[in-house]
Curated annotation (Swiss-Prot):
It comes from the Bacteria. This is Trans-aconitate 2-methyltransferase. InterPro entries: Methyltransf_25 (IPR041698), SAM-dependent_MTases_sf (IPR029063), Trans-aconitate_MeTrfase (IPR023506), Trans_acon_MeTrfase_C (IPR023149). Residues 272-303 have a biased composition (Gly residues). Its EC number is 2.1.1.144. It comes from Streptomyces coelicolor (strain ATCC BAA-471 / A3(2) / M145). The lineage of its organism: Bacteria, Bacillati, Actinomycetota, Actinomycetes, Kitasatosporales. It is found in: Cytoplasm. The gene is tam. It is an enzyme of class 2 (transferase). The keyword Methyltransferase applies.
Length: 303
């Protein structure tokens, strides 16, 4: 795990917005009814906000706050801020997932393709669950493709003789996320009922070097950051990586197939549970306010 999370390019990230949004819609479909109306919802690691708005479609009266610690992502997301068509409200605020804690109870805390950037994130679950309202839900999705060629070849290249010294410790490894069984164990130990599953999507990506174009927006960001001051070296790494990706993911007549495994969890806090949760709160609240809200190392929006 890099010492600082990577910087983000919203335009590059959104080049595959439809494919990246599909896991979020699948996660959304498995979230049960929320205990309050209007519900209070926090989206931790909201990125450019394009999927945060889907929460308002599901819960039109909700007061929703999207959190991220990338200023560029938040700037893009704020185009969606304001009253929603169902009478709710959507806003965005800076926060770092490693230190964020809700200041008021949430009915739903959702985190989509963010927690892989947060070492030891499962240790944060008890505190988050404690701040859920009784009957509230913690829902998350993380990429589970760290053993796929896209990531394995990147790590192997970064660890090669040419690049090892410059890129040591930059890339995440397969321990960045837990197994489905691991998430189930943590969430049930925190007192929740949990629905945990995995899905492998086979995206058909258009264009030349499509897998490279995908990872430029996400997994490759730490390498691009590390070599940012040396454009020649950065381009040389990308050229080497492009060559091995072409062999691993050959283009076909209608695009490049790109299998991508993801892990999901939906954990519901019991209705009668204790802790700090509750369904009170002022109607003017824009969502689950959070402490630890200063902008940290840019980029909780990794997908």
């Amino acid at each position: 795990m890099p010492a600082t999370a990577p910087t983000w390019d919203p335009a590059q990230y959104l080049r595959h917005a439809g494919h990246r949004a599909r896991p979020f819609t699948d996660l959304l479909a498995r979230i049960p009814d929320l205990p309050a109306d209007p519900p209070r919802i926090a989206d931790l690691g909201c990125g450019p906000g394009n999927v945060t708005v889907l929460l308002a479609d599901r819960w039109p009266t909700a007061r929703i706050t999207g959190y991220d610690n990338s200023p560029r992502m938040l700037e893009r997301a704020r185009q969606y801020a304001g009253p929603t068509s169902g009478g709710g409200h959507l806003d965005f605020a800076p926060a770092d997932a490693r230190s964020w804690t809700p200041d008021e109870p949430c009915d739903l805390l959702v985190s989509n393709a963010t927690l892989q950037w947060v070492p030891g994130h499962a240790d944060l679950f008890p505190g988050w669950i404690d701040r859920l309202a009784p009957g509230g839900t913690l829902a998350l999705q993380v990429p589970g493709n760290f053993d796929a060629p896209s990531h394995r070849l990147m790590r192997e290249l970064a660890d090669s003789r040419r690049w090892r010294e410059r890129l040591a410790g930059v890339l995440r490894h397969d321990d960045a996320v837990l197994t489905p069984e691991g998430y189930l164990a943590h969430l049930t130990a925190a007192g929740c009922t949990a629905d945990v599953w995995e899905t492998t999507y086979v995206h058909l990506l258009p264009g030349d070097d499509a897998v490279l174009d995908w990872v430029r927006g996400t997994g490759l960001r730490p390498v691009l950051d590390a070599l940012d001051g040396d454009p020649a070296a950065r381009d040389a790494f990308v050229d080497e990586y492009r060559a091995v990706l072409r062999a691993a993911y050959p283009a076909q007549a209608h695009g490049t197939p790109f299998p991508f495994r993801r892990v999901f969890a939906v954990a519901r806090k019991p209705e009668g549970s204790g802790g700090s949760g509750g369904s009170g709160g002022s109607a003017g609240s824009a969502g689950c306010a959070g402490s630890g809200g200063s902008v940290g190392p840019a980029g909780e929006a990794g997908r």
